[in-house]
Curated annotation (Swiss-Prot):
This is Large ribosomal subunit protein uL15. InterPro entries: Rbsml_uL15_N, Ribosomal_uL15, Ribosomal_uL15/eL18, Ribosomal_uL15/eL18_sf, Ribosomal_uL15_CS. Residues 1-39 are annotated as: Disordered. Belongs to the universal ribosomal protein uL15 family. Part of the 50S ribosomal subunit. PROSITE patterns: RIBOSOMAL_L15 (PS00475). Residues 1-13 have a biased composition (Basic residues). Binds to the 23S rRNA. Pfam families: Ribosomal_L27A. One of its GO terms (cellular component) is large ribosomal subunit. GO terms for biological process: translation.
Amino acid sequence: MIRKKKKVKKIRGSRTCGGGSHKKRRGAGNKGGRGMAGGHKHKWTWIIKYCPDYFGKYGFKRHPSLVKRLETINVGELEEIVLKNPDKFEKEDDKFVVDVIELGYEKVLGKGKVTIPMIVKAVEVSEKAREKIEAVGGEVVEL
């Protein structure tokens, strides 16, 4: 059986309920405002010390409509697609002709392995992808 009296019960009746002076524990007024209030005034030294970059302008964000994002595909994935359905792709001099734009992509990146020679047509091709395609006897055609 618990015989200890709760702290709240002991405190009830006293004006400040264990908060010290009546001036203390007055809410946000006691802390100099809520959050970052006073950052340019009485909390300026704190800002300078702990958040020096809080105020001011740094760079800008371009509007999403102006940002050009290319749909990308890796060389390894491209080869997988060709190997799964080889009858969908034309052949020129024993090389598969892969038009990346028809597949819904614009740029070819260099992740993965290339084992079959391909003629890859794309808007952009990374250096690594170009090296891998040409290493097995393929070609790259930038549109």
